[in-house]
Amino acid sequence: MATNNANYRIKTIKDGCTAEELFRGDGLTYNDFIILPGFIDFGAADVNISGQFTKRIRLHIPIVSSPMDTITENEMAKTMALMGGVGVLHNNCTVERQVEMVKSVKAYRNGFISKPKSVPPNTPISNIIRIKEEKGISGILVTENGDPHGKLLGIVCTKDIDYVKNKDTPVSAVMTRREKMTVERAPIQLEEAMDVLNRSRYGYLPIVNENDEVVNLCSRRDAVRARDYPHSTLDKSGRLICAAATSTRPEDKRRVAALADVGVDVLVLDSSQGNTIYQIAFIKWVKSTYPHLEVVAGNVVTQDQAKNLIDAGADGIRIGMGSGSICITQEVLACGRPQGTAVYKVAQYCASRGVPCTADGGLRQVGDICKALAIGANCAMLGGMLSGTTETPGEYFFKGGVRLKVYRGMGSLEAMSQGKESGKRYLSENEAVQVAQGVSGNVVDKGSAAKLIAYVSKGLQQSAQDIGEISFDAIREKMYAGQVLFSRRSPTAQGEGGVHSLHSYEKKLFAAKM
């Protein structure tokens, strides 16, 4: 049966064009072509849509939120990582502000807490209240000497101190004592520890050694998040993966040092034209100074641009120049490339070098994301599609009875006046006259980004199913082998492929049972 199915997959009749033939002539974008269907012998739920973001980081959902100041701050970055993607924190702010955002993301979901907050038994309750307010934690370990890895005596939680009137009372008088606590002995796997927490009624699970000394700690909050978001993008310690943008000027080395200190996982070098001596030198410096950090370089639209950045040590490449919905680089500067052609050409070269690439710009709907992944991109970066969601920065406002949010390009005059870093992206931060390469506008409230990403995920699975492949890795492999076929679309065909011939209609993209 399997052999017969394999035979059904092989395209023996040349009906359509290969990707190489499709992109041989004029520059194309996503709406200019369509993917031809293949043979289906599996369910959509079986499709693996995961993609490589950098050499070492793979995303369960190959979606990255753009480092724009109206798209990605800590709330969006948390949501993206929880859902299985990753968010790139914008850098149009002070170093200190960006560092705080990274800390917020990294602290949102812990695996093992290696240095849990601990106090000695004579600590007054007033100190516990202060620590809880400053750190935002509800449970504090009590150890023999206050050392995070000292002998465990007990734990003090909010319920233990809420009704104690004398705030000078020592925690030893109100804490839950060691003999009444649920603990586990090291070594233990994180999944086992989370399972114990799920089955117990306690908020925290200390892990101790044979001397009853604290090794680390697990919290119920993190166990619940692990249960509710089983495909989260995590680091080796079980914390959410976090990426952050930076420019490539010498003074940006201080920003990188500060980000590295608080545990950022990926640096995204943010430039509209990445093939510069500044970025090449910056990549080399980062990889030699912080070899554990992954570096995504760009933006590029040609193979030569990508080659220079990969030669410098880039762990990932970002593709796109002037194709975003709020970007006017191509019309103002007459420089760029149609995004479909850019993705195919650059991704082809990146694949030959074993470096993942991310398509950035021109993605208006799930079909565009599918096309980008099918012609070579490993991941897709979203800005406009995520704009107006609850997790984006900024407040909603009403105009004409419609609930809106601001969405602007980082090359807009508004963004460049907000912070110097936006100007650095376009190599114009010190210019007396700044040429806008983006616009600012308003977008309609789209609800939760979590629901939108879930919709994108399901849409990608169904797209791959129609193409007839079990994963996008398989689609790309077959595409390069000429076994995934395409067709050009005329303007009339594009109109035919959309909604037409109706007096009126309401376009709902998904119905969420969440």
UniProtKB/Swiss-Prot annotation:
Binding, NAD(+): D270, S271, S272, G320, M321, G322
Pathway(s) per entry: Purine metabolism; XMP biosynthesis via de novo pathway; XMP from IMP: step 1/1
Record has Repeat as a keyword: yes
Regulation of its function: Mycophenolic acid (MPA) is a non-competitive inhibitor that prevents formation of the closed enzyme conformation by binding to the same site as the amobile flap. In contrast, mizoribine monophosphate (MZP) is a competitive inhibitor that induces the closed conformation. MPA is a potent inhibitor of mammalian IMPDHs but a poor inhibitor of the bacterial enzymes. MZP is a more potent inhibitor of bacterial IMPDH. Potently inhibited by MPA. Inhibited by XMP and GMP.
The protein's required cofactors: K(+)
Any one of the GO CC terms: glycosome
Disulfide pattern: none
Complex formation: Heterotetramer. Interacts with glycosomal protein sorting receptor PEX5.
Protein name, as recorded: Inosine-5'-monophosphate dehydrogenase
